[in-house]
Amino acid sequence: MSVKKKDLITLQDPEAKYPLPLIEKEQINHNTRRFRFGLPSPDHVLGLPVGNYVHLLAQINNELVIRAYTPVSSDDDQGFVDLIIKIYFKNVHPKYPEGGKMTQYLENMKIGDTILFRGPTGRLFYNEPGTLLIKTDKTSEPEKKLVHHLGMIAGGTGITPMLQLIRHITKDTSDGTRMSLLFANQTEEDILLRKELEEVATTHQNQFSLWYTLDRPPSGWEYSSGFITADMIKEHLPPPGEATLILVCGPPPLIQEAAHPSLEQLGYTKDMIFTY
């Protein structure tokens, strides 16, 4: 059985590149899409350890462009891999008039077009309930960290690596690891995977809690507003401790100007913080 299973893993070699076809595309909101890529057969799984991600590679205007993404599908899904990606269009952001190279390339892909996948990649592995393996860099040996409570700070599509862990941990009701998510977005419309996150928060209250903050909240908004602050972290995430790990994923300003300074201010040490 194990031999057959290995044969049906798509990402057999982390250095190889696997061309996968686009088989479905769904518009989630004005600038976010779900892209579904087909695996070599309906029985194949991607073969991605929980905590890891993939790279997509494409030749765009004679330049090799490589970007990292965490799928929202898992190895419970056969025959396909799903990515949720925000498209950075031209002339929207004054700092980036050209927009995103890879995201606009994906947006222009037609059904049946292929793109190269490479992986698994990553420094974090969810080994077994309450145990993470973490590499300090790509080449180092993974170190074991026992975790009772995972805090999560996510901005925009930075939710995808968090969702991977949330799904995996809540699937096992005997896993006592707690997770608390602080999820930052610009507007209410930008909150990705909201329905699923709120469902999990309701059905797995002993494992998962959820809090939002919005840059531009609507009137009557019940959650926080503005950039992530130390007070928000203090109120909604686990305090510093040996069995605490805070995971951070999102755009650079969220990480460098909000999450990291606030965490340091509250006394979280480097070994309590993991940034994707």
UniProtKB/Swiss-Prot annotation:
Q: Boundaries of each FAD-binding FR-type domain copy?
A: 15-127
**Enzyme Commission code(s) on record:** 1.6.2.2
Q: Which domain of life is it from?
A: Eukaryota
A GO molecular function term, named singly, is: cytochrome-b5 reductase activity, acting on NAD(P)H
User: GO CC terms for this protein?
Assistant: endoplasmic reticulum membrane; membrane; mitochondrion
Question: Reaction catalysed?
Answer: 2 Fe(III)-[cytochrome b5] + NADH = 2 Fe(II)-[cytochrome b5] + NAD(+) + H(+)
User: Where in the sequence is N6-acetyllysine found?
Assistant: 17
GO-annotated biological processes: sterol biosynthetic process
Q: Which Pfam families match?
A: FAD_binding_6, NAD_binding_1
Entry keyword set: Acetylation, FAD, Flavoprotein, Lipid biosynthesis, Lipid metabolism, NAD, Oxidoreductase, Phosphoprotein, Steroid biosynthesis, Steroid metabolism, Sterol biosynthesis, Sterol metabolism
Among InterPro entries, the record links this protein to: CBR-like, Cbr1-like_FAD-bd_dom, FAD-bd_FR_type, Flavoprot_Pyr_Nucl_cyt_Rdtase, FNR_nucleotide-bd, OxRdtase_FAD/NAD-bd, Riboflavin_synthase-like_b-brl
Known function: NADH-cytochrome b5 reductases are involved in desaturation and elongation of fatty acids, cholesterol biosynthesis, drug metabolism, and, in erythrocyte, methemoglobin reduction. Responsible for NADH-dependent lucigenin chemiluminescence in spermatozoa by reducing both lucigenin and 2-[4-iodophenyl]-3-[4-nitrophenyl]-5-[2,4-disulfophenyl]-2H tetrazolium monosodium salt (WST-1).
Q: What is this protein called?
A: NADH-cytochrome b5 reductase 2
- The organism encoding this protein is Rattus norvegicus
